[in-house]
């Protein structure tokens, strides 16, 4: 009888825990995805803060030339970063217990791998948590679908690209100037500016900013005015009313006259679908572009594609970009290569004899 009561008590504790996790009444929703999201994001954030402040220099290129990234080792907020895991580690799973000492783990950039893997798990669970809360509230799932765009982008630069290049040392550093360095080297090695998927991403981000500003300003400019207690609520907008707070007909009429009639949405659902889909699809394409360039399927190469009748090259902007790419390529990781990768990739001429 005692054992039976204990089982019931333990079951009720588990049941209460399940009810608490899945409840939609909590001030902050937990959800089953949150059970994994909370510890992974807390771990990633804590290690990031500690490493950004105090981590020793990291041998990123695996050539015994450590690069400093933390504040206590001479950096500021702009130049500081979590330095990627050493090329000597490659793609190996490198937790603390795999190193001979904590000093070795820090020297080889172990914190980067720890932060990135916990962060990616955490943001994926955040996306799952968005879906879970939507599901429990009877909503449609498109919030999580929209969030999949930045999740895909982060996964591309922190995981897919290192996998394609063979080392976590090629991942994006976790800092401001480190991000710029990653972008410059990526352009040098993959010609990303000439990749159509990157162009779609630029259109998505800039277009999304434009459409967001247009929508917000139009709605704000066509708000129905708030009424006072001395006039009828029918005369304008009353705080807290359930109906739409702006006049979409007025906004449609204004914008239709500003551009032309069919450039303006008169359907609120179509408008908001467009506002969500434009940047999301653009960022999806950019993430896909990074993931294909990870395996060296690079941007278009139009180098020396225009020649005169004598066969002499007439430079185009593609040739100017190519010259810049070569300059950036020979300058990065300057002590890790004896010659640029473009020269190294050429097969040696056959020798007959």
Swiss-Prot record:
Residues 345-353 form a propeptide. It is an enzyme of class 1 (oxidoreductase). Disulfide bonds: none annotated. It is a multi-pass membrane protein. [CaMn4O5] cluster binds at residues 170, 189, 332-333, 342, 344. The chain crosses the membrane at residues 29-46, 118-133, 142-156, 197-218, 274-288. The keyword Magnesium applies. The record marks 190 as: Stabilizes free radical intermediate. A quinone binds at residues 215, 264-265. Signal peptide: none annotated. Pheophytin a binds at residue 126. Keywords: Acetylation, Calcium, Chlorophyll, Chloroplast, Chromophore, Electron transport, Herbicide resistance, Iron, Magnesium, Manganese, Membrane, Metal-binding, Oxidoreductase, Phosphoprotein, Photosynthesis, Photosystem II, Plastid, Thylakoid, Transmembrane, Transmembrane helix, Transport. The record marks 161 as: Tyrosine radical intermediate. 2 of the reaction center chlorophylls (ChlD1 and ChlD2) are entirely coordinated by water. Herbicides such as atrazine, BNT, diuron or ioxynil bind in the Q(B) binding site and block subsequent electron transfer. Photosystem II (PSII) is a light-driven water:plastoquinone oxidoreductase that uses light energy to abstract electrons from H(2)O, generating O(2) and a proton gradient subsequently used for ATP formation. It consists of a core antenna complex that captures photons, and an electron transfer chain that converts photonic excitation into a charge separation. The D1/D2 (PsbA/PsbD) reaction center heterodimer binds P680, the primary electron donor of PSII as well as several subsequent electron acceptors. PSII is composed of 1 copy each of membrane proteins PsbA, PsbB, PsbC, PsbD, PsbE, PsbF, PsbH, PsbI, PsbJ, PsbK, PsbL, PsbM, PsbT, PsbX, PsbY, PsbZ, Psb30/Ycf12, at least 3 peripheral proteins of the oxygen-evolving complex and a large number of cofactors. It forms dimeric complexes. This is Photosystem II protein D1. It comes from Dumortiera hirsuta (Liverwort). The gene is psbA.
């Amino acid at each position: 009888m005692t054992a039976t009561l204990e089982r019931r008590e333990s079951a009720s504790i588990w049941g209460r825990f399940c009810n608490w996790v899945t409840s939609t009444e909590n001030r902050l929703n937990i959800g089953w995805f949150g059970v994994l999201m909370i510890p992974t994001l807390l771990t990633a954030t804590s290690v990031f803060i500690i490493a950004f402040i105090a981590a020793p220099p990291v041998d990123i290129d695996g050539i015994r030339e450590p690069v400093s990234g933390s504040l206590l080792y001479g950096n500021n907020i702009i130049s500081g970063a979590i330095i990627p895991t050493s090329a000597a580690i490659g793609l190996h799973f490198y937790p603390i217990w795999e190193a001979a000492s904590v000093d070795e783990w820090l020297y080889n950039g172990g914190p980067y791998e720890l932060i990135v893997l916990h962060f990616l798990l955490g943001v994926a669970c955040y996306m799952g948590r968005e879906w879970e809360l939507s599901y429990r509230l009877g909503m449609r799932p498109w919030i999580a679908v929209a969030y999949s765009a930045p999740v895909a982008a982060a996964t591309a630069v922190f995981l897919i690209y290192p996998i394609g290049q063979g080392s976590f040392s090629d991942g994006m550093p976790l800092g401001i100037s480190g991000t710029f360095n990653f972008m410059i080297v990526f352009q040098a090695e993959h010609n990303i500016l000439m990749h159509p998927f990157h162009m779609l991403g630029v259109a998505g981000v800039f277009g999304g900013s434009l459409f967001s500003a247009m929508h917000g300003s139009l709605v704000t400019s066509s708000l129905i005015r708030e009424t006072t207690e001395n006039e009828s609520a029918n005369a304008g907008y009353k705080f807290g009313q359930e109906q739409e707070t702006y006049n979409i007909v007025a906004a449609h009429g204004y914008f239709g006259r500003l551009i032309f009639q069919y450039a303006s949405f008169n359907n609120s659902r179509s408008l908001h679908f467009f506002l969500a889909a434009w940047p999301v699809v653009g960022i999806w394409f950019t993430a896909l572009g990074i993931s294909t360039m990870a395996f060296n399927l690079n941007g278009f190469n139009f180098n020396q594609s225009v020649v005169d009748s004598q066969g002499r090259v007439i430079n185009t902007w593609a040739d100017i970009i190519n010259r810049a790419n070569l300059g950036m390529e020979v300058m990065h990781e300057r002590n890790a290569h004896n010659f640029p990768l473009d020269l190294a990739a050429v097969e040696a001429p056959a020798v007959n004899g």
